[in-house]
Design a protein with these regions (language model features):
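Nucleic-acid endonuclease domains
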Residues: 1-66, 74-133
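Acidic/His-rich structured neighborhood in mature extracellular/periplasmic domains
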Residues: 70
Length: 133
């Protein structure tokens, strides 16, 4: 089955619910937001690939879901991502030209079993026409 925008949004909510209950040993003690973001992006992409067919993005293309014209961002609720997605003044004024699916998480470490948990508080879709500053 091909991945649709509706599927992406519904699956993001379900993935967030499941991931918020998952204890992950590889994230224990990790404070690098980029590492957490990479982990979550890859896990969500793999989750979707088990259920749907879609074109996966790459660094050269710049967006994670090219067929849907959507990029994925992951940010901490405690320390929101400070990187700017705009590559030009035009994008800042008129928008990125693509939509975003944004996961907002709060990470907790559990020393007793050396795991971490990402409580995903929001999985938000932002339409392309809403991505301007």
């Amino acid at each position: 089955m091909n991945l649709s925008l509706s599927d992406l949004c519904n699956e993001a909510r379900e993935f967030s619910r499941q991931e918020s209950l998952h204890n992950e040993p590889t994230l224990f003690g990790v404070t690098d937001g980029k590492a957490v973001g990479t982990y979550l992006e890859q896990k969500f992409r793999d989750y979707l690939l088990e259920r749907y067919q879609f074109e996966t993005g790459n660094s050269a293309r710049g967006i994670d879901f090219p067929s849907l014209n959507i990029d994925m961002k992951v940010t901490s609720a405690r320390q929101p991502q400070s990187s700017c997605p705009f590559r030009s003044a035009r994008q800042k004024v008129y928008g990125l030209g693509y939509g975003l699916i944004v996961f907002v998480y709060d990470k907790s470490d559990y020393p007793e079993n050396r795991t971490a948990r990402l409580n995903i508080s929001n999985a938000i879709y932002i339409a392309p026409d809403r991505t301007a500053d």
